[in-house]
Regions:
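Conserved C-terminal helix/tail region of periplasmic/extracytoplasmic solute-binding proteins
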Residues: 34, 66, 83, 159, ...
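Short, solvent-exposed loop/beta-turn-alpha elements that line the ligand-binding surface or hinge
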Residues: 112-128, 193, 209-231, 278-292, ...
Length: 434
């Protein structure tokens, strides 16, 4: 594929957004507005610093409104949006994860006008972006980014146990993990109630065995032979190969464990690798070499029914209770203008993948081959609720961690049959409206 220079890239992508900010004059409606934007604490801190020190001052000048950025732990976003909706006041713009917009759609401003212009100008949104933000009646939120979930692993350690490439199947991964754990280098994975690494592991694992919550028509089919086999395998896999303390981990514990050299692999975004790039003298291998040289990335292994991915998706919802809806929309238009969004995207160094296809051509992807697997994460990921339609019910199942808990219960001693029966019953309650 031919690569674009930055000038050509921005010229091509900006054409479709001409007129979004056609003049340099701030919109008159926004002169006294203050837009309160709440998002997660980025796992690439440099990006939040860029927003605060450079991009938001530029945005305020461009749209004529004050913008207040609040950052919180990603696990706190759902409680905050729920509380704001109940009280009828709070941030004007909420960052949400995955299919969560379907839960709060009744309280969302229709942002079709903003999102459609951005998607059209930037090569079209990936299917996962459309599925998570559109309910068939309106666009609930504006797609922001896809955070690729890949396995970060220590290349040399896997080579020591006979794997010159990352294991292709779950059976191979089990074998490698068992050997690594015997050497004091277990695999690391959370099965806790944390928004990122737990579901992005448990859902693709389930799908790869042929299990799924619902079929194409939305009928609950979780209680199946395929699901049961996945749980049986997980029981032995967990005991033999993983750091069993991972049951209580959040989305930061595995980063710390990997960087301290106590685990050999973990499903994660690229934040571990990016941290070793940022501090090469701090993170060293046992041979006193920069750890960054020994890190590689790979998709999750293949199961009996294929290889799947679930990548953390982010979007921004403008709230109906907001008195600054127009200014909030103008801000989202501004920040998604390619010349502006590119600054943030480049600061992420590949940790976040834009939700539209045009960005696959960006030159940044050629700069570091270790990051190459993340380039097409948005193209390959599925949404929770597969193979059924994305909706409020699938979002509720995700929010309640039912799929993750099914595996967590089994590795803590519940029989596979009981764990599957419990999970299927919980999913059925949600889909039947019980």
């Amino acid at each position: 594929m031919s690569r674009f220079t930055r000038r050509k890239f921005l010229q091509a992508s900006g054409a479709g957004l001409a007129g979004i900010l056609a003049t340099h004059q701030a919109p008159s409606f926004a002169q006294q507005s203050t837009v309160h934007w709440i998002k997660w604490n980025d796992f690439v801190p440099a990006s939040d610093e860029l927003l605060r020190k450079q991009m938001l001052p530029e945005a305020m000048k461009a749209i004529g409104a004050k913008i207040t950025l609040e950052t919180v732990n990603g696990n706190d976003l759902q409680p905050r949006v729920t509380s704001a909706i109940q009280s009828g006041s709070g941030p004007d713009v909420f960052m949400l994860f995955n299919n969560h917009p379907h839960i709060y759609g009744a309280s969302a401003v229709d942002v079709s006008d903003v999102a459609e212009a951005i998607g059209k100008a930037q090569g079209g949104y990936y299917n996962v972006a459309k599925a998570n933000t559109q309910d068939g009646k309106k666009t609930l939120s504006v797609p922001w980014a896809v955070i690729g979930a890949m396995t970060s692993y220590r290349k040399s350690w896997f080579e020591e146990v006979g794997y010159n490439e990352f294991p292709k199947t779950w059976q191979e991964y089990h074998d490698a993990g068992k050997k690594l754990k015997a050497k004091g280098r277990p695999l690391g994975q959370t099965l806790g109630h944390t928004f990122g690494d737990a579901p992005t592991f448990s859902y693709p694992y389930l799908w790869s065995w042929g299990g799924k919550e619902v079929d194409e028509k939305g009928k609950v089919v979780l209680d199946s032979k395929e699901t049961l086999e996945s749980v049986k395998f997980m029981q032995a896999f967990w005991k033999d190969s993983f750091d069993e303390g991972g049951l209580a981990w959040d989305d930061t514990n595995n980063n710390r464990a990997f960087l301290s050299g106590t685990i050999s692999a973990t499903l994660n975004g690229a934040s571990i690798y990016i941290e070793t790039l940022r501090k090469p003298d701090q993170y060293k291998t046992e041979k006193d070499r920069p750890m960054k040289e020994d890190i590689r990335h790979s998709p999750l292994p293949r199961g009996p029914k294929g290889q799947f991915g679930f990548h953390l998706f982010q979007s921004h919802m403008v709230m109906q209770y907001s008195k600054n809806q127009k200014a909030a929309k103008e801000f989202l238009k501004w920040i998604h203008t390619p010349a502006n969004y590119e600054k943030w995207f480049v600061s992420q160094k590949g940790y976040s993948t834009p939700p539209a296809a045009m960005w696959e051509k960006h030159k940044m992807w050629d700069e570091d081959p270790v990051m190459a697997p993340f380039k097409i994460a948005g193209k390959l990921g599925l949404s929770p609720g597969y193979a059924g339609p994305p909706n409020r019910k699938s979002a509720e199942v995700l929010t309640k961690y039912i799929v993750t808990d099914m595996y967590a219960k089994a590795v803590q001693g519940m029989s596979p049959q009981e764990a599957v029966k419990w999970a299927a019953g919980e999913v059925q309650k949600i889909y039947s409206g019980a």
